[in-house]
């Protein structure tokens, strides 16, 4: 298994290959989408053992740390694969890649115990270098969802960056917002100030305006998968701390397959 000190070195190298909020669109044949792993290094290793070899691209949707005690090693494992082939691995940012959550859900304590508190600065630098989003095969991939003032995908490329918390409202909402059936527009979320639920009408408008098929995201605890807003939004959850299944989504040409681990 990747050691903590090795992770410290890997994230420094990986950071230099990131550094912009929106990645270039990708068109590939076989894609593996991985949701929140939250320190579940066993799930991450299974993804690489079972699916990586046949894939053209693996997209991680954020939330690698917190809610467990192997977040450092989980980050290191993914970063090591990313450095082997940066064109085959995408590491998107989640809301738990932030000092807004790490002091409360375990990652700051984990880093302090394994590497010393001062080393957390390097993880913060890594987190703020992570991209928010990428369009893959005409699906918008990100952690949370669309934002109240986001009209086009191209706006993401112009967001303030790096933005550690993030403080920009759009950047924050990309990581924190959730889809909800039976609502219209945007409604304040129980997650707190600045976070919103988005409904089917604004989602359909955004997808149509940007010629997108749908949204693939993480962020919510589900039993592997959930489809919302008439299937336009797919949520993937790839950890097992909640006692349910970990899911990965495979997009192979026009065929979409949900696999529970």
Question: Residues of each region from the PLM?
Answer:
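Feature recognizes metal-dependent phosphohydrolase scaffolds
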Residues: 1-261
């Amino acid at each position: 298994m990747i050691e903590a000190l090795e992770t410290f070195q890997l994230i420094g190298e990986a950071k230099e290959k990131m550094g912009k909020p929106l990645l270039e669109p990708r068109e590939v044949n076989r894609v593996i989408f991985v949701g929140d792993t939250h320190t579940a290094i066993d799930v991450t290793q299974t993804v690489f053992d079972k699916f990586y070899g046949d894939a053209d691209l693996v997209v991680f949707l954020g939330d690698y740390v917190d809610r467990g005690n192997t977040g450092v090693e989980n980050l290191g494992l993914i970063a090591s694969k990313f450095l082997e082939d940066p064109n085959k691995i995408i590491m998107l940012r989640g809301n738990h890649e932030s000092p807004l959550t790490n002091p409360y859900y375990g990652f700051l304590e984990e880093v302090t115990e394994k590497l010393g508190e001062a080393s957390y600065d390097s993880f913060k630098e890594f987190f703020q270098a992570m991209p928010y989003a990428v369009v893959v095969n005409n699906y918008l991939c990100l952690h949370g969802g669309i934002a109240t003032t986001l009209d086009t995908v191209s706006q993401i490329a112009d967001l303030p960056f790096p933005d550690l918390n993030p403080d920009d409202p759009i950047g924050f909402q990309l990581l924190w917002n959730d889809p909800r059936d039976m609502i219209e527009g945007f409604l304040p979320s129980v997650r707190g100030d600045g976070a919103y639920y988005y409904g089917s009408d604004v989602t359909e408008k955004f997808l149509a305006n940007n010629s997108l098929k749908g949204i693939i995201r993480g962020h919510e605890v589900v039993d592997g998968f959930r489809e919302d807003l008439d299937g336009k939004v797919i949520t993937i959850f790839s950890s097992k701390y909640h006692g349910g299944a970990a899911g990965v989504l495979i997009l192979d040409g026009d065929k979409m397959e949900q696999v529970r681990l």
